[in-house]
Amino acid sequence: MKRIAIQGLIGSFHDIAAHLYFEGEQIQLICCATFEEVFANMKKDPTMIGMLAIENTIAGSLLHNYELLRESGTTIVGEHKLHISHCICCLPEDDWDTITEVHSHPVALMQCRQFLAHHPHMKNVEGEDTAGSAKMIAEGQKKGWAAICHAEAAKLYGLKVLENHIEDNKHNFTRFLVVSNPNKADMLRPLMEANKASIVFSLPHEEGSLSHVLAILSFYKINLTKIQSLPIIGHEWEYLFYVDVMYNDLTRYRQAIDAITPLTKDLTILGEYKDGKQTN
């Protein structure tokens, strides 16, 4: 049985993404309060797998997770893109006219601003987790309180769904990375099926240094799908570049990496894996 460390509780979006990615397999979830705790658990138990959100189509990148990933020494072995849909739920005996507060993670509240604007009498209260808000209301029998979470979390904690799909943007997806100890990577993903890679590097503080790297990737027909820069602490105006690329020829990809390595500093391959499917 695979043991998967996630941030959040049972019923959270990490839980849903993990079960979809490992569909048909037996898994045991290790629920963690923070992403730091996810990597700490993996360090203590090298057989453990981690799953963490890395970017959202509305909220953008989770910048801190890039740093945690790079510093952890783990490797990316897969990804999953999950459609994010929210519902508002409450205790079975409550209804619209009794709700005075709505609790959820601040990002979830932000993603439902238009819906909440139509219910100004509901006080918005930020919590640490979408599923955690549902659990708190259910276990504490918080009358007059509602939670914004996934419908599966509402069902799990026995809450009544007042309305589903309340998110402002229906094209809201979060990309999750699956990470493991490098020594276990080949057991979790066949390298020959990989068509995507995540790399990180810094560059000399010289004119055109980034464009030279991008030109080489283009020459080798490597498709750049994402680039994210983060400042290097203690080095003013210098940056780490986190880059995702896709390829259909492993040899040509390897040649491209060999070609850009002399132009970069501290280039690290964070993972080579198969482009993840997107679920609605």
Where in the sequence are the language-model features?
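Domain-level signature for soluble enzymes in the chorismate/prephenate branch of the shikimate pathway
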Residues: 1-280
